[in-house]
Swiss-Prot record:
Pfam families: Antimicrobial_2 (PF08023). It comes from the Eukaryota. Keywords: Antibiotic, Antimicrobial, Secreted. The keyword Secreted applies. Antimicrobial peptide active against the Gram-positive bacterium S.aureus (MIC=12.5 uM) and against the Gram-negative bacterium E.coli (MIC=6 uM). Has no antifungal activity against C.albicans. Shows hemolytic activity against human erythrocytes only at high concentrations (LC(50)=210 uM). Expressed by the skin glands. GO terms for biological process: defense response to Gram-negative bacterium; defense response to Gram-positive bacterium; killing of cells of another organism. GO terms for cellular component: extracellular region. This is Esculentin-1GRa. InterPro entries: Antimicrobial_frog_2. It is found in: Secreted.
Length: 46
């Protein structure tokens, strides 16, 4: 029915937002790690 359609959409949106947020957090960690590694390679401290 209409309600289940709406609920499904809401749940999908929540999951999508959650995944986007987690992706952003993980992405930031990866970027930070990458910057750290690049920095120590440049300085020769790895």
């Amino acid at each position: 029915g209409l309600f289940s359609k709406f609920a499904g959409k809401g749940i999908k949106n929540l999951i999508f937002k959650g995944v986007k947020h987690i992706g952003k957090e993980v992405g930031m960690d990866v970027i930070r790690t990458g910057i750290d590694v690049a920095g120590c390679k440049i300085k020769g401290e790895c």
